[in-house]
Amino acid sequence: MAARLCCQLDPARDVLCLRPVGAESRGRPLPGPLGALPPASPPIVPSDHGAHLSLRGLPVCAFSSAGPCALRFTSARRMETTVNAHWNLPKVLHKRTLGLSAMSTTDLEAYFKDCVFTEWEELGEEFRLKVFVLGGCRHKLVCSPAPCNFFTSA
């Protein structure tokens, strides 16, 4: 499955949801098993998590028909450590992670396209590609090292 997601702001929960644009694969796929880990708590989304899909580094909720929880997608090349993470983020997105301001859906779409989608399509599989949770997601990440605590610290 190619990285084709659309940003949808859920005003009721004040979170950004990323939903698959279509079920068809486009562009270069990311091979390998999903290898989903069981959630730490009872799932808050339906169990149809799309285990047949082959994206690595995604939480279980990423393939739910209800849509994934609020996520930020980035590559390890752009964020080598959690210490310098804010230097690689647009200022408004950094503020959004700290709850200081909202970022428009258009700005977020541009950020995702520039930082992630182009990279996936041009370079293909990126072994060090990781997914970090902005907040509100209780699902474990697949193939992820130690949890990122940058977004929960002030």
UniProtKB/Swiss-Prot annotation:
Post-translational modification: A fraction may be phosphorylated in insect cells and HepG2 cells, a human hepatoblastoma cell line. Phosphorylated in vitro by host protein kinase C or mitogen-activated protein kinase. N-acetylated in insect cells.
Sequence segments annotated as region (Mitochondrial targeting sequence): 68-117
InterPro entries: Transactivation_prot_X
Subcellular location: Host cytoplasm; Host nucleus; Host mitochondrion
Primary localization: host cell
Family, as annotated: Belongs to the orthohepadnavirus protein X family.
Function, as annotated: Multifunctional protein that plays a role in silencing host antiviral defenses and promoting viral transcription. Does not seem to be essential for HBV infection. May be directly involved in development of cirrhosis and liver cancer (hepatocellular carcinoma). Most of cytosolic activities involve modulation of cytosolic calcium. The effect on apoptosis is controversial depending on the cell types in which the studies have been conducted. May induce apoptosis by localizing in mitochondria and causing loss of mitochondrial membrane potential.
Protein name: Protein X
Organism: Hepatitis B virus genotype B2 (isolate Vietnam/9873/1997)
